[in-house]
């Protein structure tokens, strides 16, 4: 089971806000991964088979980030968040030398969801300023 969510157009993402995903080229037919078009939150369900006590998902994000016009060139970052909190180990940082210079970043994490529970994930701008995000691609794969 795999899901792919995308947003190709450039979007302005304020500091502390989530990247929005507008399209779902690959959808989950079992209801394990739930997403509303245009939203930034993705819900992972802890539906388990047999004796398993957790459902494990591999979450991967790839996209282009840049400092928008009016911003200050310097380090900008995104990270995968779980339950509204950024996971520090998933921080993807780029340091554009000029406003508008786009950098490709990627990050991934395993997310365990206990049987009967759900987890909300997102890709969050953890920079201190707004960023532009283009060609955003979030892939979620159930691996166990």
Q: What do the predicted segments below correspond to?
A:
Residues 1-144:
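Extracellular jelly-roll beta-sandwich "head" domains, especially the C-terminal globular C1q domain
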């Amino acid at each position: 089971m795999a899901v792919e969510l995308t947003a190709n157009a450039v979007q302005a993402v304020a500091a502390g806000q989530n990247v929005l995903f507008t399209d779902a080229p690959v959808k989950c037919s079992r209801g394990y991964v739930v997403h509303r078009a245009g939203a930034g939150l993705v819900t992972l369900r802890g539906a388990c088979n047999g004796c398993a006590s957790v459902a494990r998902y591999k979450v991967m994000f790839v996209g282009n980030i840049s400092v928008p016009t009016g911003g200050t060139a310097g380090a900008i970052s995104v990270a995968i968040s779980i339950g509204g909190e950024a996971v520090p180990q998933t921080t993807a940082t780029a340091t554009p030398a000029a406003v508008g210079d786009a950098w490709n970043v990627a990050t991934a994490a395993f997310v365990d969801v206990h049987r009967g529970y759900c987890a909300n994930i997102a890709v969050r701008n953890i920079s201190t300023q707004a960023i532009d995000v283009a060609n955003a691609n979030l892939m979620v794969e159930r691996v166990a």
